[in-house]
């Protein structure tokens, strides 16, 4: 799946799942060396160091990550929340004609929610209305 990241004021750079794996490590750990990212991804998904460095370099080329020296420190230039928002916006446009209401209705129809989740959703809607 493709995620979009911010370029200027517009989210228009595509971030693929492999790049998202790297971004998730950076978001979870903050500024982190490429070597540390490689170690984490080797352990969690079995990537070798070359694969990890290739994907990190793609993230840098796309403007999602900044390389800082010394030690090839990776710094996220985009937040997880920005990527989430852009992904939701893209899904809404692509699958629901841009209708948040239709997308939300589909989510409700295709998933069972606990009482606590329902209460939390009601609270969020109430806060949004206020």
Which residue ranges define each predicted feature?
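Short, cationic-aromatic polyanion-contact patches
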Residues: 13-18, 70-89
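Basic amphipathic alpha-helical segments that dock to polyanions
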Residues: 22, 53-60
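Short acidic, hydrophobic short linear motifs in intrinsically disordered regions
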Residues: 32-41
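Short helix-coil-helix linker/hinge
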Residues: 15-18, 31, 97
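A short, conserved structural fragment
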Residues: 60-69
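Short capping segments at the starts of secondary-structure elements
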Residues: 25-33
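Amphipathic alpha-helical dimerization/coiled-coil segments
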Residues: 88-129
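Short alpha-helical segments that sit at the start of domains
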Residues: 2-25, 82-83
